[in-house]
């Protein structure tokens, strides 16, 4: 049992260390330290889809403030790029840890404990567009493939990802599969192409519903991208043969500018957020134009090591029936 446990840990560390090295080199970002707590009221917390409740923390020696365990560092990263004067094309990545206790379900792919490579870059002048989004997606996808090939060489786990990733808009997906749910559409397109970047998540689609929810104040999901389609963000999905389903590795996007922020808070009814310090800074032009996202570390390890449950690659909390069902839960 000890030998198996140690081997399991070595595999996880190999995936994380290898991916980190490739990501820093290929994406040209610097690794920095990030916070676990966010001060309530400054607007820095990631509100995700807007319904999740964060973990509240009271610090004994800071009695006049309340803090929350971060959901992600989406807005902190942009603030930090501005604070320290990062230039166009430069960026950072954080080994982020977070808690999301309001996850809809604790299942094979969802945990209350979140670990991500949380990254952000300043967009070069004139490149706040779909072409730059796609270029960045292709760079990160190359990092995934390089890591998969390294895992294959070390552990004899066959590489399965295609050389190229397929891009498709959520509007195209609705037209292609009008009778399917968003999840069923993801399964259908990902099973066909094995690796897909789904563009435009958050805005209302021709069927009257968004593909999925997104907060209004980090990704730009309303600007026109091309051919009448909207959204400069998306998800990377791969086909997971172990689970027989599409598997989201991470979300990313070009971040809101002043106009997109105002437009999106009007759509979601979150205009009160514009009174927060973070949002005022953005509206006053104090933040650079950026692109960023969060790459799930445990999800990456789970996929590349062909595990059937995320609890096999991270230590979290689970109902007893999960531990009874899966032998290798950590």
From Swiss-Prot:
Compartments in which it is found: Cytoplasm
**Keywords for the protein's UniProt record, in alphabetical order:** Amino-acid biosynthesis, Asparagine biosynthesis, ATP-binding, Cytoplasm, Ligase, Nucleotide-binding
Kindly state a single biological-process term from the GO annotations of this entry: L-asparagine biosynthetic process
**Pathway(s) per entry:** Amino-acid biosynthesis; L-asparagine biosynthesis; L-asparagine from L-aspartate (ammonia route): step 1/1
Q: Which GO terms describe its molecular function?
A: aspartate-ammonia ligase activity; ATP binding; catalytic activity, acting on a protein; transferase activity
Q: Which reaction does it catalyse?
A: L-aspartate + NH4(+) + ATP = L-asparagine + AMP + diphosphate + H(+)
Database matches in Gene3D superfamilies: Bira Bifunctional Protein, Domain 2
EC top class named in words: ligase
A cellular component term from Gene Ontology for this protein is: cytosol
Record-listed E.C. numbers: 6.3.1.1
Record's InterPro entries? aa-tRNA-synth_II (IPR006195), aa-tRNA-synth_II/BPL/LPL (IPR045864), AsnA (IPR004618)
Principal cellular location given in the protein's record: cytoplasm
PANTHER family (alphabetical): ASPARTATE--AMMONIA LIGASE
Family, similarity comment: Belongs to the class-II aminoacyl-tRNA synthetase family. AsnA subfamily.
What's the protein name?
Aspartate--ammonia ligase
Question: What species was this sequence derived from?
Answer: Streptococcus equi subsp. equi (strain 4047)
